[in-house]
């Protein structure tokens, strides 16, 4: 009788668990976590669960709600390309397709839990499939923009010891040119209708892959994603995030900054290589059960952008300030955005005048937010709060955001200092885990009881934060983080360049752009400066990701330096911004 009872109990648990989810080893009844549970965790009212997997605990739960009619008839992913091609997946379809993708990664590609996978794909549906497949299998997902050059890819593959790369045909030639220098890379997976010698075909393998796959029981703090983030010196650092830091940590962002519900359709303009894609196009959106809309445009243009907003029932728009600066130059009153109700921006400071022009022309407010690759959303203008033009808004839970001095002391309102997040007595779960293989850089982010962002700001008496500038020399242009070292390294490869210093320079559309101060070698000093500028710009575009090239170049006799010979970038930067 006892055996029969135990069998019936086990059968009940098996039938009620989420699809593709293994039972806990102790066969305890599985209780699904809800959006309210995730919010309670972010508000520190509930402990972090021991185990968590975004695919099983979030995506598969929305799939269940679709079956029971608890979620509106709204796609999970809606992709278009402006050429008549369209993809619409429900959460159920996303689940079955991502299980097929998981089998592709683990069987023909031979990847196992904890292996690192580099993914360099444009805004195509396969990017989302591979992302979710990695979550299901415990494979560490490492996204990169398709603008990466062969040199950039080589660094990332060698630094991460990636065992496999998933790439599109735009990137495959660059990978091929450096693959022999990557001894850890075992498999190349091509997402393309074309076949390449030495590459496995994702489409062919996916077509015959099984939909049966059991999701790995991942720990909440288990590594899930690595982002390469630029700094002022050296090459990009590998910021590692866990299943919960991204998968649970963006709950409040989704509910109160993005203001999403399961009936919403969000269009987030971020490139797939950046953490902003994780915020707006994966975790925040799908935590709330919303639809992620994607328009793959060959090249951004305002007319196509505005036509998309008028044609599709997009309710929520998230774009960098650069896009809004371009849009407000159009006569927006001619357009009818019938469904659009909530607009957001972030990645760089937004000019107050642009915010006002957008509001006057569309009747919609712009809600600015501020965050970082390492820690996600830090502060934001949230729905229901007063918007102070030019402010980044108030601090977001679970963070205690403060302004501190060089000794780690909290400064009073109105005093400029570094924007910092309190780490003690308890480190917030949504922090990045570490910079992989770089304990010195990881330790350098801590000052006393705080994590320092590297940004300077001011908090007013109402708790609103105002961005002043970078504490270091990182340039943020059109939302891209650009380290001066990478641009200077590219420039020095050209025979005309003796040395250079790269800083930010004000720009009406992009906020700030890369400017290079260049000391020329003697044989090149008589060259036509305009032609030489174009030559150097073209050289940088070929040597590193094209978005990093210096849009401004000034030839100088010498660079300002300290007594020890270090270039004083701050002098050049101040010179650029002084008259603004």
Curated annotation (Swiss-Prot):
SUPFAM superfamilies with a match to the protein in the record: Acetyl-CoA synthetase-like
Keywords tagged on the record: ATP-binding, Fatty acid metabolism, Ligase, Lipid metabolism, Magnesium, Metal-binding, Mitochondrion, Nucleotide-binding, Transit peptide
Reactions that this protein is recorded to catalyse: a medium-chain fatty acid + ATP + CoA = a medium-chain fatty acyl-CoA + AMP + diphosphate; hexanoate + ATP + CoA = hexanoyl-CoA + AMP + diphosphate; octanoate + ATP + CoA = octanoyl-CoA + AMP + diphosphate; decanoate + ATP + CoA = decanoyl-CoA + AMP + diphosphate
Co-factor(s): Mg(2+); Mn(2+)
Sample GO molecular function, one term: decanoate-CoA ligase activity
Gene Ontology biological process: acyl-CoA metabolic process; fatty acid biosynthetic process
EC number(s) from the headed UniProt entry: 6.2.1.2
Top-rank EC class of the record's enzyme: ligase
InterPro entries linked to this entry: AMP-bd_C, AMP-bd_C_sf, AMP-binding_CS, AMP-dep_synth/lig_dom, ANL_N_sf, Mitochondrial_ACSM
Signal peptide: none
CDD domains xrefs: MACS_euk
Keyword Acyltransferase: no
An example Gene Ontology CC term for this record: mitochondrion
Keyword Calcium tagged: no
PROSITE patterns linked to this entry: AMP_BINDING
The organism's place on the tree of life at top rank: Eukaryota
Transit peptide: 1-22
Binding sites annotated in the UniProt record for ATP: 229-237, 368-373, 455, 470, 566
Localization terms from the record: Mitochondrion
Family the UniProt entry places it in: Belongs to the ATP-dependent AMP-binding enzyme family.
Function: Catalyzes the activation of fatty acids by CoA to produce an acyl-CoA, the first step in fatty acid metabolism. Capable of activating medium-chain fatty acids with a preference for C6-12 fatty acids.
Protein name: Acyl-coenzyme A synthetase ACSM4, mitochondrial
Organism annotation: Homo sapiens (Human)
